[in-house]
């Protein structure tokens, strides 16, 4: 089984948190709301990976003013690829508290939508199990 280290930013701006709705046809949690993030490449430093994933998935304009390592977790997930293939992967999640100076987001093809969500509204979203666990641990659910 392949192992991946995943960096996940919990991005906050003016009391709201950024959630991204995964594309319906790919990823570990197709069609559900999640935190952005992705895999650390070989030889890449953790913060470099986090900033690269944010640029790739959320665009160049989103400006982070704070990045603080927060927690980690792990589990085994099945990833669905755009061509329909599936793969079981051991995932190690490194989650960071982040603050953004703006809300300028331009999502890539991994997502179909995004939202800045106040804590009291998080319960109304179809959150994937990993995001739900993270938000509970943070005291937001």
From Swiss-Prot:
InterPro entries: Nucleoside_triphosphatase_NudI, Nudix_hydrolase, NUDIX_hydrolase-like_dom_sf, NUDIX_hydrolase_CS, NUDIX_hydrolase_dom. Its cofactor is Mg(2+). The keyword Hydrolase applies. Disulfide bonds: none annotated. A motif (Nudix box) lies at residues 38-59. It catalyses: a ribonucleoside 5'-triphosphate + H2O = a ribonucleoside 5'-phosphate + diphosphate + H(+); a 2'-deoxyribonucleoside 5'-triphosphate + H2O = a 2'-deoxyribonucleoside 5'-phosphate + diphosphate + H(+); dUTP + H2O = dUMP + diphosphate + H(+); dTTP + H2O = dTMP + diphosphate + H(+). Residues 1-141 form the Nudix hydrolase domain. GO terms for molecular function: dCTP diphosphatase activity; dTTP diphosphatase activity; dUTP diphosphatase activity; magnesium ion binding. It comes from the Bacteria. Pfam families: NUDIX. Monomer. HAMAP family: Nudix_NudI (MF_01846). Belongs to the Nudix hydrolase family. NudI subfamily. Catalyzes the hydrolysis of nucleoside triphosphates, with a preference for pyrimidine deoxynucleoside triphosphates (dUTP, dTTP and dCTP). This is Nucleoside triphosphatase NudI. It comes from Escherichia coli O17:K52:H18 (strain UMN026 / ExPEC).
């Amino acid at each position: 089984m392949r192992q991946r280290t995943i960096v996940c930013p919990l991005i906050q701006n003016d009391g709201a948190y950024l959630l991204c709705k995964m594309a319906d046809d790919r990823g570990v949690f197709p069609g559900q709301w999640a935190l952005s993030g992705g895999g650390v490449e070989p030889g890449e430093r953790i913060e470099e990976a986090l900033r690269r994933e944010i640029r790739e998935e959320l665009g160049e304009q989103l400006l982070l003013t704070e990045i603080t390592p927060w927690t980690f977790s792990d589990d085994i997930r099945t990833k669905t690829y755009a061509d329909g293939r599936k793969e079981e992967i051991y995932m190690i999640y490194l989650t960071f508290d982040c603050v953004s100076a703006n809300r300028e987001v331009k999502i890539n093809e991994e997502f179909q939508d995004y939202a800045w969500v106040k804590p009291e509204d998080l319960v109304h979203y179809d959150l994937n199990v990993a995001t739900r666990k993270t938000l509970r641990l943070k005291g937001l659910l």
